Every structure is written in structure tokens, then in C-alpha cells.
């Protein structure tokens, strides 16, 4: 049996992975990518520039950042992602073991959401992000919070293999050479971003024993299902910077 992660077969390379797991029926695009992109522009990036989406998938966030004025490129392990290359610069790469197919110091910003947990080791991704980021550039890494998902939701996607906590995600980035690292919990409920005083209520609500899709076959309306799900399935959001020259 292969001992190295790069030697192991992975379903992530199969076009059917995106078609099934992130089908527009199961995961409609909606307004969330645009709302998150704007939030990150205002709170993390602070300006526009060249942005690389590592693990760009269907291209939802490429569209969102492009509409805000960013010059976007994407990279993903799935050949289905590269099928949208007629719109954006999109390349395929095994993020587990291959170097990112971009030049050193090429991008002002890095964005990577729900990717690093799919990798057996994070260092190829984060060291690659460091290499292609310009000095002073900012990277945003998002991944499920193990503290909030260990009881089951982490494995809703069967390809999740490496969980993270606030300190472990920060350590990974520091080892790669990043500085000014902030790692924190992040609720995927846009109205909470604007009204942080509501967080205690959300935390109390999350403790209620309510089922939700897709973890269980609950029959709530979509809006209430999202409230239940994203009060419980909290993300980690790390913002860091490559040192200036």
C-alpha cells in the first residue's frame, strides 16, 4: 500500500466529486460568496489587486471577487474546475504534493476556503501560498472548526482528513513564515458579521438539539435550516501576512 499521501488515489481528482458533492442542486450558489467576498475585502484585504483562490472548485468565489474588481486566478485538483478557464486563469494541481503553478511573488492576496482540511499535510499548500504571495501580501485561510464539528458534521464531506483548531491553524501558518497571524472562530451567518452583539444568542441557539440538513434528513425551510446548521458548524478564519522586504 502507498505510504505517502501523494501516492494514494484520491476522489478529489474525479470530476464527479464536484458534480456530486457540490452540485448546484445540493449546494446552490446563492448570495453567500458575494457577501463573504465583500466582507473580506472590507475587513482583511482592504483593497483590490491580484487574488489567487486555492481550491477554487466551481468558481463561485472567483466570480464574487471578480465582481468586486479583483484580478482573479484559481487552482484546484479537479479537472472540472479548470473547465471554466475560458473566463478566468484556472490551473489544475495536486495541492497535496505539487507546487502551485504560478510565479513567485505574483499575487497580492490569497483566498482558500474549505480546502486545507482535505489534505493529509497542509505544508505544501501554505508554503506554496507563501511563495506566490507578494511581500506584504495578505492570505485568508478558512476551514471547519474541529471544536464545533468533531461530533459528526466534520465528516459530512467524506474527503475531510485533517481537522484544525484555532492554535493549530495559526501554528501551520507561522511555520510557513507568515506573520501578523489572526486565527478565530467565524460564523457563516452574514447578519452576525454586522451585529456581533447577537453572538451570545447564536451560541445559545446552537445548543438546542435541533437536526438539520445535510447532516440529518430534517424538513425545515431552507432559511431556518441554514440558521441551525451555521450556528453549529462554525468555521475558523485565519488572516496572515507575508513579511515585507
Feature-to-residue mapping (PLM):
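Conserved N-terminal segment of class I S-adenosyl-L-methionine
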Residues: 1-103, 109-113, 123-126, 186, ...
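A short hydrophobic/small-residue beta-strand
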Residues: 72, 139-140
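A C-terminal cap/extension of S-adenosyl-L-methionine-dependent methyltransferases
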Residues: 90-92, 140, 184-245
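A short His-aromatic
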Residues: 114-118
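Short N-terminal helix/helix-N-cap motif within the alpha/beta-hydrolase-1
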Residues: 119-124, 151
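A short glycine-rich, Lys/Arg-flanked "PGG" loop and its adjoining helix->strand segment in the class I
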Residues: 123-135
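Short, glycine-/aromatic-enriched active-site segment of Class I SAM-dependent methyltransferases
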Residues: 141-162
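Short alpha-helix
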Residues: 162-176
